[in-house]
């Protein structure tokens, strides 16, 4: 089975020996795919999930304590483990050097600040994470969401470090201070 950005951007390059291809988001088809519901050779084109808060929390037990763990470090922090999170999809921008809008379109969707905090508190309580790295295309696409998340993190007194990916022109001094 193939999935991910490649299947959307370059569907003609997928080898014929591949049994299944998912173009789009797989959360609502993955169980049926693994369960053999679809015939071999099918290309599944899924709709965009509009409300990312509606997705269930991932079953972190499947991978958090494995030998090849999804726990990372950050170069500027001695604290670990750091857990990667992806709380949004796509990007509202269309930078000439980037393929994100070609793959996802410019329909940016995101989890709410409340959902993100809930997941962070869960990961802190269950796995004692030291921090989070928001691995997504454009974390501060909604400054309002970033401010709200920062306020919730401060109010909750959760002791973590965190980092995100952004553009220099997307942040200002006020946002940096609360982050």
Sequence positions of predicted segments:
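Radical SAM [4Fe-4S] cluster-binding motif and immediate context
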Residues: 60-179
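Glycine-rich beta-alpha loop elements in corrinoid/cobalamin-binding modules
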Residues: 1-56
């Amino acid at each position: 089975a193939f999935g991910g950005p490649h299947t959307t951007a370059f569907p003609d390059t997928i080898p014929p020996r591949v049994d299944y291809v998912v173009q789009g988001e797989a959360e609502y088809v993955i169980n049926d795919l693994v369960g053999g519901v679809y015939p071999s050779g099918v290309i599944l084109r899924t709709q965009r999930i509009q409300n990312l808060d509606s997705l269930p929390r991932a079953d972190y037990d499947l991978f958090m304590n494995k030998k090849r763990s999804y726990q990372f470090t950050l170069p500027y922090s001695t604290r670990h483990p750091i857990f990667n999170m992806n709380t949004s999809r796509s990007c509202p921008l269309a930078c000439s050097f980037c393929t994100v809008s070609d793959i996802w379109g410019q329909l940016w969707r995101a989890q709410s600040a409340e959902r993100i905090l809930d997941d962070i508190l869960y990961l802190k309580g269950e796995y004692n994470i030291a921090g989070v790295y928001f691995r997504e295309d454009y974390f501060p696409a909604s400054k309002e969401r970033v401010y709200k998340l920062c306020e919730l993190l401060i109010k909750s007194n959760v002791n973590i470090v965190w980092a995100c990916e952004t553009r220099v022109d997307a942040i200002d001094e006020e946002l940096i201070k609360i982050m």
